[in-house]
Amino acid sequence: MSQRTEHNGSWLRNAGSLLSVLACVAVLASPASATPASAAAAATPRTDDYLKRAERILKFTPLIDGHNDLPNFIRKTTKNQIYEGKIPFEDELPGHTDLKRLRKGRVGGQFWSVYTPCPDPPVPIDDPTWSVRDTLEQIDVTKRLIEKYSRDLQFCGDARCARRAFRRGKIASFLGIEGGHQIGNSLGDLRRVYELGVRYITVTHNCDNAFATAQSTVADGLPDTGLMKPFGIEFVKEMNRLGMLVDLSHVSANTMRDTLKVARAPVIFSHSSAYAVSNHLRNVPDDVLKEVAKNNGVVMVTFVSRFVNVENPDAADINTVVDHIFHIAKVAGWDHVGIGGDYDGTVYLPKGLEDVSKYPHLIARVLERGATTQQVRKLVGENILRVWTEVERIAKRLQKTELPNEAYWEGRNWTRPAKRDLNADFEGRSVPLFTSASNGDFCD
């Protein structure tokens, strides 16, 4: 073989090798032959996939939020006038809540707070205030709103109604009172508001009352005396007998502990988060979370920025709330965690949870963090419905053997001084018509 022929053969062999290498490179570069690593990446669910999964869950499981302050928003903005376009609920309201966003958020049930503020200090517990009147007005406006938008909302007074309303495509609507001051510290008024449809009472708001100590008192550096004895105990007992949910949001840590010792039915926290994650006194300590699990109750996680991130509220975001959900699930179990956003009760909300339309995004993040479909179903609604059903069952049993509780606060005044001398209306009588002790008993 000549030197030239030998050179040509060598070139052909080299060219063949090069073509083989290029062919391999082409095959490796083609989409059909992805590496195991790239295949795994392609199989990883995206955020959109979790959101679709969340939407599917909320299509078949009612999302029930424990606390929304829309009624107070209405009171402050329109003085409870809702007709003639004053509250265009079907359109976008300036707050966090309206019908359009509730539907977008897949809300299946809502506890509407018929909140009225604590009396300004230093009003004594038994001083006459307008709290009960204002509470009745808030019950009235909320029920009128539900009736006005009855195509979309349905008033409910029990857990079965909530499920029926959801199956009919309506948003089940319930009432909650935020503080014992709203019933005038009276067990008689407790029974009356139950008759009007209220189904939970927060034991205190940001003030002590005849029943218990508020967390705000402890925040001010005063002692945590817990549940007031004996009247606070009688209050809890009567709520259990009625079937009224006992709500421990806003109360002091010792009030939480004392109540859990005497409660005969599961309790709720309508809008509180985990103290171990953010050490704000509005949140629930781990020892209490464990007792809630024993009690078969539920803690409904709130979204308020300064509660979920006490050190840096501006940094609070949707993942911060997920942290609270998972902590409560870890300590108490997935059977004892729920959602209570506190929309329209605050102006400071985490990034990603700006209004009621954002619930599916929260559920998507919970799924992305590793929660199962069954765990999410418990979180969004099954837990609070289980608790409510159990409270109703226990109440029926207690009502067979117990009469309405006639206890009263030992510091209460049973008469009030008259504004004028009633005897002056009856001058000339030989015997005064009214004695000084009875002057305040007449309401002419």
From Swiss-Prot:
E.C. code: 3.4.13.19
Name this polypeptide is given: Putative dipeptidase CPSG_03667
Secretion signal span: 1-34
One Pfam family matching this protein: Peptidase_M19
Domain of life, per lineage: Eukaryota
Function noted in UniProt: Hydrolyzes a wide range of dipeptides.
Disulfide bonds, paired cysteine numbers: C118-C207
Family annotation (InterPro entries): Dipep_AS (IPR000180), Metal_Hydrolase (IPR032466), Pept_M19 (IPR008257)
Lineage per the UniProt record: Eukaryota, Fungi, Dikarya, Ascomycota, Pezizomycotina
